[in-house]
Amino acid sequence: MIRKTSAMVEAGILAAIAIVMALISMYVPVLGAFVNFVWPLPIVICGSRHGLKWSIMTLLVATIIIAMIMSPVNAFFLAAIFGLLGLILGECMRRHLPPMKLMLFGAIGGIIALVLNIVLSFVVLGIDPINMMFTSFDESLVQLAEYYREHGMSEADIKASIDGYKEMFRMMKIIMPGAFLVCAPIMAFVNYICAKKILTKLGDSFESFPSFIMLKVPQWVLWPYFLSLLAVTYFYQTDQSSWMYAAAVNVQTVCSFSLVFQGIVLIYWYVETKKKPRWWANIGTALLFMIPLFSQIIVYVGAFDMVFDFRKIRNHR
């Protein structure tokens, strides 16, 4: 009875924290983006400490109150996207699954949640969130063109600039499925690390991830990467409207992300084994987000590491 009361009290506190986090994500612009990303944390902690039943209760209470305070739509999307991830991660942590297995289940849960969000938007609300987003992008381009005209830019320069943005938005729309696949494990990883730190402070213990510099991406990733590269090159020249072009671009996106990760690991391995300053690797990682050419170089670095095994950590038959 005492244990049940304790679980009920803790679930109530965690539900209140989830509600406060939802308010921050809604009304605090910069901090809100990060808080929104880790919104599953209270659900994860409750599930890990008290089980799936109490984490579901926490999610339901938080969702109902958020619907009353903010709006049913916001509550609906929070529960659909982040709630499911929180339930899965919480149950996996309660069972003390190995970190890599936990990440696999968390990533699958994140993908299901993102897809579920889009499907439910169609069915329940009758809206297409992706088309809505890109429609707003198109409208912003009209305003941007007017702004350029008011500031004396020539029509040729305006057209070149707007066409560049249109091409960027077109590619964003094509790679949206691949972006979901990439975003899901990142979301699961961030929430797992945060939950692990909190639960460790509360006296729990979890198996550690392998050393970062010893992580490796499966070698078979090279095959879909090179095949998608050939397919993208071919369909780019022949039929960019083909679904095969879109599929190839998404496969290339996911594989490129995996190879970039492999390249980053190799950079940190080199810095650590050669006793170089760690900020070298930090700057190299930062350059990925600033210089497109550098990110492509890191893709090739990751690919070469898979082929030649510079760290000598793979089993060779």
Where are these regions (language model features)?
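Central hydrophobic cores of alpha-helical transmembrane segments
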Residues: 57-65, 103-110, 278-288, 301-303
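Hydrophobic transmembrane alpha-helices
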Residues: 1-61, 275-283
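Membrane-interface interhelical loops and short interface/amphipathic helices
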Residues: 120-172
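Hydrophobic, aromatic-enriched interface-forming segments
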Residues: 151-209
